[in-house]
Each structure stands twice: as C-alpha cells, then as structure tokens.
Amino acid sequence: MIISALFVVGHDCAHEALFKSKFLQYWIGQIAMLPSLHAYNQWGYGHNRIHHGHTIKRQADFVWHPTTKEEYSEFGIFKKLTHRFFWSIWGGGFYYMIEIWFKGMVLFTAPLKEAKRDKLIMLSFAFISSGLVFILELLLSPEFLILELVCGCLQRFV
C-alpha cells in the first residue's frame, strides 16, 4: 500500500500538480517512484505524451489497446492464450510487469536526455536494494537463508 501511495505522489509530480518548483517536483517524483521501480522521466514521457496524448486511440496508446474480433482470430494459439491470460482477473499484474514495466521502463528509452539518467537511477536502486535485502536476510537469519538456498536447489532436481 505504501508503494502505491508513493507512486501516486510521483504520478502527480509528473503531471506537475504538486509543487510550483520544477526542481522539487522532479526530486520528490523521482524518490516517490523509486520503490515501485519506475524511472521518473521515462514514466512521465510514456504517461503524459503517449498515454494521455493518445488515450483510447487504437495502435497508439500502449496501455489500453483492445483487440478486435478479426485481430484475435488471426492470433496463433500462444498469443491467444497470452492475451486471454493478460486480460483476465489474474493476469493484470503480469501484463503490467511485462508489457508496461519491462518493455516500457527497461527495454525502451524515452527520447529525453533525462530518461537515461533516470533509468540508471531506477535500475541501480533495484539492484542495490535487492542486494541489501539479501545481505540483511543473511545477517539476520543465516540458517534460514542457507536452508532456503539448499531446498530451492534441491527442488530443481526432485
């Protein structure tokens, strides 16, 4: 819940709705979006220029893009299964992580000079925080981590 609330703060900063100062808007937005692993300017470009600029326009809005019956009938079996899963109640999170976050935040770089820097900040935060969580778990409960690693490795062979 806290990460979602912080994301909303970052969203409002990206819309330049919270502060008059662009400096404050950027840094508060950047910090607020880091826990959800979103690069501030990268996300702002995709959200403000592409999504809001082309909301519900077929082939332009990368977030909301319904498929016609004709398009769906031309899909192969794997694409049909993927499409049905992504648009089901269970698939929304997977859809977001793959189609929006991974393809839009990690693979794509917005044509803004700040986008590369923000992506580097976000990816650095992701790797450093993951490493810190691993180290903390090791320091606080080494036997649990070792058991987890051994059991995880053994499960692959069973």
Question: What do these predicted regions represent?
Answer:
Residues 149-158:
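Internal helical hairpin/lid segments
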Residues 3-22, 43-56, 158:
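Acidic (Asp/Glu-rich) catalytic motifs at the cytosolic membrane interface
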Residues 20-35, 63-64:
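Post-HEXXH active-site segment of zinc metalloproteases
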Residues 1, 34-150:
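Non-catalytic, topology-defining segments of multipass membrane proteins
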